Structures are given as C-alpha cells and as structure tokens.
C-alpha cells in the first residue's frame, strides 16, 4: 500500500491527474501493487503563493520549472532492482501521460513497517492481519 504525494510546478488539474495516473500505473507495473490500491495527494504550485525550490543542476540533472516531486511511502521489502524499475517507469509514464520530461521527475521512497499504517477506525489493519 503506497501513499503518494505529488507536487508539481505549473500544474493544473489535468496535468496533476495525468501525473497521478502515471505514478499509480508505474507502481502497478514495476512492483505489483493492486490496481485498486490508490492513495494520493496531488498539489499544484503556481510559484507565487505555493512554491517549490530546487537546484537546477544538482548531480548533473538539468531541471526546469516543469519539475515534479514524487514522494512514495510504502512498506519495506522491495529490492534495489524493483525500485530502479519503478523510477524508470514513473519517468516514462510521466512523459507519456503528462508531457513531463524524465529529467524533471524527482522521486523519493520512504519505507516503513505494517504497524505504521492505519486505514481508518484507529486500527493498524496490516499489523492486526499479520501482513
């Protein structure tokens, strides 16, 4: 069960939706999450009231104002190869669905344990189910 936050500059509702679909489809393709397991927060930033700051050339990647930050929180257990495949697939689909160049797709993954999730009712469902 990943929880995804997407922050994008100059992103209207259509672009945010396309980016959300790209990330979700990549999660399904690359690491096998169920298609109905979608929990996302999508935020567009206009550069005036809501801003994103970034280094335009950090590590030799040349970013511009089409930058998208994707933060994925998920349970631990994926291999380095699965994560690399996920990064590649997100970049591919962000370009295909939203026209965002791969150089502008910045992804982070944070992992946690089953006890760290409550899907409602004040219960840690994964922990109680032994998942």
Residue ranges with predicted function:
Residues 1-131:
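Interaction-mediating elements
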